[in-house]
Amino acid sequence: MTAPYTLGAKRDRYDPRDYKLASHSLAAQASAVDRKMYTMVSPDFRIDQGNEGTCVGHGDTNMLMAGTSTHKSYPDFQSEELAHQFARKLYFETTGDSTYQQGAYPRDACAKLKDWGLIGSYWSVPQVDDVVTALLTFGPVGIAVPWYTSMFYGDNRLSSDFGNYWVKVNLDSDLAGFHWVAVTGIDMAPDNGAPPFLRIENSWGEGWGWNGTARLSVESFRRLNQLDNWTFSEESF
């Protein structure tokens, strides 16, 4: 089967020096917050990696555009094309891959952003509960997940019951590869009875999902979480 979209994430090599976000210290604050949504620089921006394996560059660019506030160090993206070219540059400078097809390690891209002076710190958030707490109390998170063929398409049952577009996770479908996406929202207690979900900001243009975004249930993410998740800040800690 030919995949309708291109992926491009690699599993980070283990490094005991990785800083882990101290989410346990934020747990009390997170318990009082159910919902957090971060707004893109332009809510109409939907960058598209096309047929290139640059999801790590594009996902990190989405994270920059959905930061918790306006950061003086972050790039000022004036158009989708400028954001797209920034993402490609981040990928190339991280990997040296002029084919734009070999994929990238998420940690390396975070390190490159730090080298450029665009961020001051980046942290690993390896567990699902760490991701949830980081989203509720800190800011957007990037997640690397195995991408099954079912996930290219929506879950019609959930969409019918709760609206929007939900990622369909069927672990019995074929594994297409690994994908890096920005998570720019979370709702742990939807008021319409829907399951708790993460809002993902994909890099496949506005034609995928709900104008380029989708909901991934937290339970589905638990089944997928086996790779790497990162968050970053313009501040040094």
Regions found by a protein language model. Give the residues of each.
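Catalytic-core signature of thiol
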Residues: 1-237
